[in-house]
Amino acid sequence: MREHIETVPVIEAFDSGDECPFCYLERMCEQRTIRYVLGPGASYMEPDVRAQTDHDGFCREHAKKLYDYGNALGCGLMMQTYYVHLIEQLTMYADGFQMPDKRPLFGRRTVEEEPIVTWAKERQGSCYICKRLKSNMYRYYATFFALIKDPEFRQKVEQGKGYCMRHFIDLMVTAHDELPNSQREWFYPTVLRTMRDNLIRVKGDIDGFVAQFDYRQAGGKKDPAVKDAVSRGMEKLQGLHPADPPYKQDP
């Protein structure tokens, strides 16, 4: 299997032992983007990056992760210009707001259809980091499906730990468009088998973890293999790493 700059991260993810290789890639991309925005390069000071963060903003999850990263000044500077645009736009929409009737007549807008409400929903649903993650993950999926042609990589997929439910859905849908029929005939049965086998494996680990708290097991030896069963079980279901500490800038 020939490796090059695009395939290395995907191969590394499948070799990582993570419950979902795409969660591994997503975490790597997310941390890299946080570091890009607030890290030593101070991208938040570049006009083009600031213009984009002013436009896109950050979702709740990534606003918290940016705060946790530890560069409070960088966060403050980004919020300064973001607030300028936010106030300008709010003022513009507020000036044109017309209070809808409680029971609007036919053809009249409801309050949910008011431009200011539509604008506010769009602002809350937009995130600079989410956009970059989506773009990067699309490229990783494309690389993954290109690698499927390689017998050595297929073996990694067959022997892997499956995927989280979130990325499982993405793979099932994307494979339909990315793979020819000959490869889909291998892909779908393989993914479904590895998903089922590994869900059973994780369920067994959770059972083992819970059993250690049974009073009948008092004084028994703890099994280190199931110590992290709860966090791995959560990753399988939701595609997250709940045991990860906050990602912080280097001291």
State each model region's role.
Residues 1-162, 166-251:
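Intrinsically disordered, low-complexity regulatory regions of eukaryotic proteins
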